[in-house]
Amino acid sequence: MFARMSDLHVLLLMVLAGKTAFGLSLLSFLTEPDPDWTPDQYEYSQEYNNQEENASSTTAYSDNPDWYYEEDDPCLSNPCTHGGDCLVSGATFTCRCPDPFSGNRCQNVQNKCKNNPCGRGDCLITQSPPYHRCACKHPYRGSDCSRVVPVCRPNPCQNGGTCSRQRRRSKFTCACPDQFKGKLCEIGPDDCYVDDGYSYRGRVSKTIHQHTCLYWNSHLLLQEKYNMFMEDAEAHGIGEHNFCRNPDGDKKPWCFIKVNNVKVKWEYCDVPACSALDVANPEGRPTEPLTKFPEFGSCGRTEIAEKKVKRIFGGFKSTAGKHPWQASLQTSLRLTVSTPQGHYCGGALIHPCWVLTAAHCTEIKTKYLKVVLGDQDLTKTEFHEQSFGVQKIFKYSHYIEIDDIPYNDIALLKLKPVDGHCALESKYVKTVCLPDGPFLSGTECYISGWGVTETGEGSRHLLDAKVKLISNTICNSRQLYDHSIDDNMICAGNLQKPGQDSCQGDSGGPLTCEKDGTSYIYGIVSWGLECGKRPGVYTQVTKFLTWIKATMEKEASF
């Protein structure tokens, strides 16, 4: 029923195993008294019984604060970039770099274009042999762009454009159909940018002064901060093309251009901003509400100031209302001998009637399932709680488990209205926003939950912890998940200090990242190995936005 019941620990609460975990938490108890903090019963019953052993743990930690990290494998965090292999060499490491990369961490890109002129084209660096190629200007062809082909055969004009030859054999023009433009009629009527264009993924490759953009993998850009070989290039929409992008959050999309055949500079692009109508209703659909139940005034905003309270097993006891979209999935069934009725998975409220969770949390029939919102202490019924039955479960159709690893691990729960309404907005119950684009590796995000999974106990209080997003390249290294992470998954944790941040969430609970003061659900707690030692693995919500919205809209029509 659950993912990896044996050796796969789905983000368990226990962060540092055994007595040593207690040594870390007890020290903070003694040095930072907090009159508002109430310890968990679980904490007392499981960790406070053997005072002699606990005292010795504390002493060991005090004498050597780096005790936990002394024998860390230097390759654990895979410091080698660009798919390099990390080799342990005594107390340090060396990186074995694939072509065309070099450097002590494979951070440099070798310029394979130095002795390979492209004539009527631009030389590009590639990641496959011979690690360079020529991007020829039409109508030139060949490995060095020296051969000329007929300019209009085959027709280079796209989207039904008509090609006309000019006097010079290499010159031509495209007569574009209505609403299409560009040298090859490649730019459609919907090619525009929203806000500052950070999420722009169109095909404009001309600047406002009509200069042609350089390819992002041009050899001329190897020394630039932004190119195809930068970390998270794909998340920025940067690849082996020369389309305008805005990776640094400038005021609009831009690109690099070549000046005097040598010098590189940048210019803003000739791409229009989308009109207000396009932004509000990009597909021209009737602007009907999603359901008959009104949505909340806003999403992803809290009314609670962050308050740092006593650390509990590597996480923090969360302030009530700090994660108002947090949902507790509870069942009236006893799932296993060690798991009683009650809370068993987490979720996130994305609409008054909809909760997002993991597919592997939805093997229970709706009649045995309820969702509690605004919950802080699982042992109490609090005044700000709202409880709902589940009307329907929508599991993603391609969800599957292979070798105990859940793929496409996402599901939607449609809540059953109470007294004619679903969730009511309050300080303690709010919706989290769906993301409109990717977040970068290294972004600090939150996981939250009670730390309860199907194989162990957790805290009675809602916990949270900060984690950092980790690129799939690093997460797929041999030292971590060895190519088990697919494009619909993301990793998050703390590679420098493992053990303090990977186990506070519940299966199905939210990984939320913030932008401009608004929280977005970027991941769903899915699975992991060696809890506290490797990053947690999450379903990447941006990969399923179309399915989420289509499912909710379809149900709204009933």
Swiss-Prot record:
Molecular function terms, GO-annotated: calcium ion binding; serine-type endopeptidase activity
Site (described: Cleavage): R478, Q479
Keywords: Cleavage on pair of basic residues, Disulfide bond, EGF-like domain, Glycoprotein, Hydrolase, Kringle, Protease, Repeat, Secreted, Serine protease, Signal
EC number in record: 3.4.21.-
Cellular component annotations (GO), alphabetically ordered: extracellular space
UniProt cross-references to Pfam families, sorted A to Z: EGF (PF00008), Kringle (PF00051), Trypsin (PF00089)
PROSITE patterns according to UniProt: EGF_1, EGF_2, EGF_3, KRINGLE_1, KRINGLE_2, TRYPSIN_DOM, TRYPSIN_HIS, TRYPSIN_SER
UniProt subcellular location: Secreted
Active site per the UniProt annotation: H360, D409, S507
Example GO BP: blood coagulation
Span of domain Peptidase S1: 312-553
Record's comment on post-translational modification: Proteolytic cleavage at Gly-23 or Leu-27 can give rise to the 50 kDa heavy chain (HC) and cleavage at Arg-311 or Lys-317 can give rise to the 27 kDa light chain (LC). The HC can undergo further proteolytic cleavage giving rise to a 26 kDa fragment. The LC can undergo further proteolytic cleavage at Arg-311 leading to a 17-kDa fragment and at Arg-478 leading to a 8-kDa fragment.
Carbohydrate-modified residues: N54
Disulfide bonding pattern of the chain: C75-C86, C80-C95, C97-C106, C113-C123, C118-C134, C136-C145, C152-C163, C157-C174, C176-C185, C192-C274, C213-C255, C244-C269, C299-C433, C345-C361, C353-C422, C445-C513, C475-C491, C503-C531
Domain Kringle: 191-274
Group of enzyme by EC: hydrolase
Signal peptide bounds: 1-23
EGF-like domain: residues covered: 71-107, 109-146, 148-186
Superkingdom of source: Eukaryota
Protein purpose: Cleaves the alpha-chain at multiple sites and the beta-chain between 'Lys-53' and 'Lys-54' but not the gamma-chain of fibrinogen and therefore does not initiate the formation of the fibrin clot and does not cause the fibrinolysis directly. It does not cleave (activate) prothrombin and plasminogen but converts the inactive single chain urinary plasminogen activator (pro-urokinase) to the active two chain form. Activates coagulation factor VII. May function as a tumor suppressor negatively regulating cell proliferation and cell migration.
Subunit structure: Heterodimer; disulfide-linked. Heterodimer of a 50 kDa heavy and a 27 kDa light chain linked by a disulfide bond.
Family per record: Belongs to the peptidase S1 family.
The name this protein goes by in its record: Factor VII-activating protease
Organism: Bos taurus
